[in-house]
Amino acid sequence: MSHASRPTPLEARGSTPLTGRVRVPGDKSISHRALILGALAVGETKITGLLEGEDVLNTAKAMAALGAKVERVGEGAWRVHGVGVGGFRAPDAPLDFGNSGTGCRLAMGAVAGSPIAATFDGDASLRSRPMRRILDPLELMGAKVSGGDGARLPLTLEGARDPIPMVYRTPVASAQIKSAVLLAGLSAPGETTVIEAEASRDHTERMLAQFGADIVTEPEGTHGRRITLTGQPELHGADVVVPADPSSAAFPIVAALIVPGSDLTLTDVMTNPLRTGLFTTLREMGASIEESDVRDAGEPMANLRVRASKLRGVTVPPERAPAMIDEYLVLAVAAAFAEGTTRMLGLKELRVKESDRLEATADMLRVNGVKVEIVGDDLIVHGEGRVPGGGTVATHMDHRIAMSALVMGCASDTPVKVDDTAFIATSFPDFIPMMRGLGADFV
């Protein structure tokens, strides 16, 4: 499995003002989907700006193992020659997704609609994460699961020879569940419908339409959506421009807000409203984040200018969670530097990420002198405008914990140590050198 090497510790010290103009890596969600839909399409898909982190590269390897031709033609530039819907071949070896839950779960959906069997595996972290809520709807569509106690990796998924279209209500707001069902539904005759009570990120729906699928999205209730896909289309290769990842941009954004004197511009950041809950919350806290050059290239994007700001505590409503589920860790850092109490409500989903991120976030803050409490599934941070620091943060093989802790150390009174930064490579390989280039002191 990945990351068998020794831990790579690092210490973040008080930073000089962060200044400059940078582009963070391409969006991870879009990168995974571009590779998978490219593999399911007929003809050539051209991808520019692909995130070349370990998670996405594992998805590229998996698509090649399933029969697609996947090639890198330049930095962030890739070509995929697809096999068409239902055209996957059985791989010769297990598909190893390393640390990537997204790549693994979306690929399960694609395989579930194909008449082949494939074994899915990953690193120790991914093996510990639950898969049952992805597998439940896929089994209803005709796929069969064996091994892995039926819920965890490694497991073997045998795709349905005649996938069954269905109407499925997602048990939680999860783009991964929704996407897996839609990808399996590509091979089913008739209509496959997914109903979600709370809208989750809609990258799969947008990209399916771009590749030629017949897909319709309608409102459902107060905050939900009903997505209907007509199966057995012929998807056609497309040109995909991958915008900068807002989840990666979150780290330099928060760093710039908390380091006095900072003035930082991030270019081409995706501003899809189902991904920008963090930006909304930070602005409510008093953050100076200005958009310019707003445009659309399949996904909305803009340049963001971020200046150091005095932040105040706020309450983050639970319905915002789907639009910022990966950003609560670094939001908690911002909350620690804010004046007053920040309440982040309804964070149950953080418990089933790369680690139990709810407990890990609280631990990260506590060991650095921040007053924090967990009440049920709510995280409550009592900000005092400063963070003492001085602690060592256990990352639990989680890239976002590592980056959040390093951001905290940029502005804490004393340095913050991180026990292992190796897993940052899964999503943001150049994070450390990029931050150093902006003025961060990581040693």
UniProtKB/Swiss-Prot annotation:
Domain of life of the native organism: Bacteria
Subcellular location: Cytoplasm
Annotated CDD domains: EPSP_synthase (cd01556)
Pfam families given in the database record: EPSP_synthase
GO biological process: amino acid biosynthetic process; aromatic amino acid family biosynthetic process; chorismate biosynthetic process
Pathway: Metabolic intermediate biosynthesis; chorismate biosynthesis; chorismate from D-erythrose 4-phosphate and phosphoenolpyruvate: step 6/7
Active site annotation, chain numbering: D326 (proton acceptor)
Its EC number(s): 2.5.1.19
SUPFAM superfamilies the UniProt entry points to: EPT/RTPC-like (SSF55205)
NCBIfam families: aroA (TIGR01356)
Role noted for this protein: Catalyzes the transfer of the enolpyruvyl moiety of phosphoenolpyruvate (PEP) to the 5-hydroxyl of shikimate-3-phosphate (S3P) to produce enolpyruvyl shikimate-3-phosphate and inorganic phosphate.
Family: Belongs to the EPSP synthase family.
Subunit composition and interactions: Monomer.
Listed name of the protein: 3-phosphoshikimate 1-carboxyvinyltransferase
Phylogenetic lineage: Bacteria, Pseudomonadati, Pseudomonadota, Alphaproteobacteria, Hyphomicrobiales
